[in-house]
Amino acid sequence: TLIGTTESEYTGGLAHPSITAAEQAYLLDMASRYFQRDLGVHDVVWTFAGLRPLLAASLDDPKSVTRDYVIDFDRSGPPLLSMYGGKLTTYRKLAEQVVDLLAPALGLASSAWTGAIPLPGGDMPDGDFAGFLAQAQVSHGWLAPTLLHRYARAYGTRIGRLLAGCSQVTDLGEEVLPGLYAQEIHYLRTVEFARTAQDILYRRSKLGVHLAADSEKTLDEWLA
């Protein structure tokens, strides 16, 4: 279960923000209201923190802070577009508005299209995952069912690209961590731009949540 978020003013270094003890206690207290027992720090298997800029209409009034983004498009000279704020849940809307503003300046035609286009790997017929998984079991029956299901859920129709050249488990290469083979690592680095163990274990997947505490160190050493 993923719980969050908190909103606290942050004054530390920008490179490696982390959750504070007070924020963790707040989230555990809030979540405990919905469980039969109280949650404690020992129940937490992973935490992450991020920072986002917020715009205030008045520095004297914290309530004036907006969680939305602001686009400033200066047409007085060469087109200059600046974006402020924004969040994960509005990234697509923001990107479409930016492209719509910039396209005419670049002599390009543009209209919103992302709402009707599936994400990479999501182009399975009629969005039928069960049918897709059944076909994958025929094509890649040599894989353990749990591993095949994870690949199908994570990569969708790109599973063929992930498993290109593989017809048996040994073709996946070294099992660097439980359930994580060299073949998948190579795919994530070359196709999904992963660079570090943290990229692979948390940003491209959530495998790190279910692995031993030293898994990130083990993978970083393997990647070196």
Feature roles, as predicted:
Residues 1-3, 7-223:
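C-terminal catalytic lobe of FAD-dependent flavoproteins
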